[in-house]
């Protein structure tokens, strides 16, 4: 569980309907929340958020592989985003996510399909690597080393990788500054 006590603003990048933000705001209602999504998803997100009483979540149309958010936030969440992008877009999504953060802000990248640097484990990462190769034009599971290199290039430090209870991976890091 993340300590959100120092977080006043969060952006969920590629967050679909925004339910992660709804859950965060149930725990910390004072957090300012922004959902950044592609235009087709951003168009329907406000209605879904309204059903949860989260009308004050800002919905921003955008593509993190092209440009950062217009605002600055203490925490950027990318769940099941980086894993489905080609390598150049995966890298640019992390670089642009860093540009969405305040100095010292945090990034949380969560999802399935991360493999060890030798690409031999964990088993679910290897399985998803094969799946991604078949589903996406440039699909592959990225290694821990690739994530660390992209985050380091973007200015992150204190990079950690942990395994969540569902078996997925969570990378966390803090922006220098």
Question: Where are the language model's segments positioned?
Answer:
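Phosphate/ATP-binding catalytic cores across multiple sugar-kinase/actin-like superfamilies
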Residues: 1
């Amino acid at each position: 569980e993340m300590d959100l006590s120092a977080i006043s603003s969060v952006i969920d990048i590629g967050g679909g309907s925004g339910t992660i933000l709804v859950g965060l705001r149930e725990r910390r209602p004072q957090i300012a929340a922004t959902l950044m999504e592609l235009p087709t998803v951003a168009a329907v997100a406000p209605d879904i958020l309204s059903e949860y009483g989260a009308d004050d979540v800002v919905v921003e149309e955008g593509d993190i592989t092209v440009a950062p958010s217009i605002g600055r936030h203490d925490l950027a969440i990318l769940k099941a985003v980086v894993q489905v992008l080609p390598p150049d877009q995966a890298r640019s999504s992390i670089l642009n996510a860093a540009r969405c953060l305040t100095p010292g802000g945090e990034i949380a990248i969560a999802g399935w399909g991360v493999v060890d640097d030798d690409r031999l484990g964990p088993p679910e990462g290897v399985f998803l690597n094969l799946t991604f190769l078949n589903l996406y034009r440039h699909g592959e599971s990225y290694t821990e080393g690739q994530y660390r290199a992209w985050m380091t290039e973007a200015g992150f430090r204190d990079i950690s990788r942990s395994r969540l209870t569902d078996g997925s991976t969570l990378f966390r890091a803090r922006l220098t500054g």
